[in-house]
């Protein structure tokens, strides 16, 4: 690539070389945008949530070269969580770790090689779980389940990273209700920093994306979380995405104070 740039520079000059580079970058991202929009049009016609996420996985919907789970699962984007997760495991004496959705297990091996835990990774996409099972060991297992409605495995900590911002309000509360009847002590959740009210929470169809603020309506979590850290995304200029650790009793209290009912998915 560098050799090609030098050839272009010698034959075209600096101005034309820069213009050509910008044009290639623009065309690349325009093509990605076109492909995404075409997939999106078909995706939200699918009524089954499981089939929707199957489609996202099978088509590489997020169009990322390193991870089919999207840029948030790249090693670069997971630098901070790979630093903080071992600290949480040690501080809170975590022995059983439940990771859902686990995605394509791209970054988690970097954590597991340095901690002593029993790990269960889970996702709604069966083909993804089948692929992940090549990584199974005595202390590493994978199971297919729907975190909204299926029984969650007993564990000390559940990681639910980069998930709720893809869920409708109804499905978020379904999951939280399901979490409350589980035998899980702590949960690590993604939320976006919104100190200056840069955005308002909005409802979506599950499988889509929007930023989410768990400390604003309709969730209204209290800011008495146990632990937090910046969960950097390589495409964010500012560090808006954070992860927050809560106990199950905290989640229960939030939901008791702010009961919400959504009759159907979406709006």
Features from the language model and the residues they span:
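Class I (Rossmann-like) S-adenosyl-L-methionine-dependent methyltransferase catalytic domain
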Residues: 5-155, 167-267
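A conserved beta-strand element that flanks and buttresses the S-adenosyl-L-methionine
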Residues: 159
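Hydrophobic adenine-recognition pocket in adenosine-nucleotide-binding enzymes
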Residues: 163
């Amino acid at each position: 690539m560098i050799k090609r740039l030098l050839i272009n520079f010698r034959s075209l000059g600096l101005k034309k070389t820069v213009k050509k580079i910008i044009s290639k970058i623009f065309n690349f991202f325009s093509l990605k945008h076109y492909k995404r929009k075409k997939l999106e049009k078909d995706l939200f016609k699918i009524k089954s949530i499981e089939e929707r996420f199957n489609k996202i996985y099978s088509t590489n919907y997020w169009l990322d070269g390193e991870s089919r789970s999207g840029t948030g699962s790249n090693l670069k984007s997971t630098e901070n969580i790979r630093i903080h997760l071992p600290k949480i495991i040690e501080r809170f004496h975590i022995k059983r770790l439940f990771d859902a959705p686990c995605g394509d297990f791209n970054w988690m091996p970097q954590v597991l090689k340095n901690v002593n835990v029993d790990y269960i990774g889970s996702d709604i996409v069966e083909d993804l779980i089948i692929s992940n099972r090549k990584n199974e060991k005595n202390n590493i297992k994978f199971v297919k389940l729907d975190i909204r409605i299926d029984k969650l495995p007993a564990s000390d900590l559940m990681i639910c990273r980069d998930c709720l911002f893809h869920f409708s309000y109804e499905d978020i509360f379904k999951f939280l209700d399901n979490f409350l009847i589980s035998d899980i002590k702590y949960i690590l959740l993604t939320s976006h920093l919104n100190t200056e009210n840069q955005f308002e929470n909005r409802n979506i169809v599950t499988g889509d994306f929007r930023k989410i603020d768990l400390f604003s309506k309709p969730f209204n979590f209290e800011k008495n979380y146990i632990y937090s850290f910046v969960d950097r995304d390589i495409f964010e200029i500012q560090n808006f995405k954070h992860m927050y650790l809560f106990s199950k009793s905290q989640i229960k209290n939030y939901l008791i104070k702010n009961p919400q009912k959504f009759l159907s998915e979406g709006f």
